[in-house]
């Protein structure tokens, strides 16, 4: 992710002038609406993947690959928005239609997870965080988490069900992937939503067709 200042512009550039504070976009070719693609060619041409990354003092990018940086944020804060911030927002608000009073379970304490925690709290949701660290769970509670579950000390899905009186979780931010998705399926409420964002434990899964 990038946050910086426009140094110079090329011919035909109209959206930015030298001196403008900008941040990068994660999908430079995806401006609005549904991404254009087909079953053989998925629309995942990202910065730092298909396009060059941003770990440099100077980079050359198309103007559509940039957005204006929020005036209320410094560069360090603004740089977290294009990937982590918008991923959490899109999952919970754009797609999830998050409402006050719903329950949100956030897995881990990484960038997407912490944004999801704060976005959910701002919308009036009850937030549960899972982590393998009691220290990180304590910090998550300071940021607004209602409950913390140490996933290394028991069955986190069962604990989540107990905390919701067996109703289950309305929104689960799934950042682990692999076999962990089985536990998310156990913990999610009827008509609930699982947003699969990370696959730290692997991309391969096997699930019961009866769940």
Where are these regions (language model features)?
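Short glycine-/small-residue-rich Rossmann-like dinucleotide-binding loops
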Residues: 10, 27, 153, 176-177, ...
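Adenosine-nucleotide cofactor-binding segment
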Residues: 103-109, 121-183
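NAD(P)H dinucleotide-binding glycine-rich loop of Rossmann-like/cofactor-binding domains
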Residues: 28-107, 142
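Glycine-rich phosphate-binding loop and adjacent beta-alpha segment
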Residues: 123, 131, 176-211
